[in-house]
UniProtKB/Swiss-Prot annotation:
Its EC number is 2.1.1.77. It is an enzyme of class 2 (transferase). Pfam families: PCMT (PF01135). Its main location: cytoplasm. Monomer. This is Probable protein-L-isoaspartate O-methyltransferase. It catalyses: [protein]-L-isoaspartate + S-adenosyl-L-methionine = [protein]-L-isoaspartate alpha-methyl ester + S-adenosyl-L-homocysteine. It is found in: Cytoplasm, Cytosol; Nucleus. The keyword Membrane does not apply. The active site is at S60. The gene is pcm2. It comes from Schizosaccharomyces pombe (strain 972 / ATCC 24843) (Fission yeast).
């Protein structure tokens, strides 16, 4: 369904995603241009395919990150709050933070403690010279924590945007409960056969679901292996 391209730079990768029509929104394009995968992916960072980041985990293919930012952009406005479940390398946390800055909040949840520590280091290298994001980090409005993504966050809080980087057999009610009205969730659902779905909650709290395309993700309930998303 998709083709892998190994590009020479982050700018070339983003341009490829634009030309491939995965990216058309200017704010999403700007966020991906500002968030270099080289900080988050040590191997072939500019190839449009999943890559190993250690601990049996892969970083999503760039076109999947582009899809997430593109679809969630209406609820990734400055001042919005976002949750990334299965935050892995920390890449999408950083990209979403650039979209909700300066007054927004982004939280990542990852169930592998060692990967949380690695992702925090990745994030700090990326935002080291970004005063706005460093201020968000210092104020704990930009953070990555160890946790069970199926349960959302431990705090009683709600989010405008929720991205789920692992598959669920069905839509977790806990995540629906943590979604604001209006709000959007991007999540892969299914077991042997999976699709990416955009879940929307309107101002009255009514839920709708739109199918985007087939994918293959590791499940939320298990430790990841090499059969990652694409």
């Amino acid at each position: 369904m998709f083709w892998s391209f190994n590009l020479s730079s982050n700018a070339a990768l983003v341009q490829h995603l634009v030309e491939s029509k995965f990216l058309t929104n200017q704010r999403a394009i700007k966020a991906m241009n500002a968030t270099s995968r080289s900080f988050y992916c040590p191997l072939s960072p500019y190839m449009d395919s999943p890559q190993s980041i250690g601990y049996g985990v892969t970083i999503s293919a760039p076109h999947m990150h582009a899809t997430a930012l593109q679809e969630l952009e209406p609820v990734l406005q400055p001042g919005c709050s976002a949750l990334d479940i299965g935050s892995g390398s920390g890449y999408l946390v950083a990209a979403m933070a650039r979209m909700v800055a300066p007054n927004g909040t982004v939280k990542g949840i990852e169930h592998i403690p060692q990967l949380v520590e690695t992702s925090k280091k990745n994030l700090l290298k990326d935002i080291n010279h970004d005063e706005v994001l460093m201020e968000m980090y210092k104020e704990k409005r930009l953070q990555i924590n160890v946790g069970d993504g199926r349960m959302g966050t431990s705090e009683d809080e709600k989010f405008d945007a929720i991205h789920v980087g692992a598959s669920a057999s069905e839509l977790p009610q806990k995540l629906v409960d943590q979604l604001k009205s209006p709000g959007k969730i991007l999540i892969p659902i299914g077991t042997y056969s999976q699709n990416i779905y955009l879940i929307e909650k309107n101002e009255q709290g009514k839920i709708s679901k739109r199918t985007l395309f087939p994918v293959r993700y590791v499940p939320l309930t298990d430790s990841p292996d090499d059969s990652s998303d694409y």
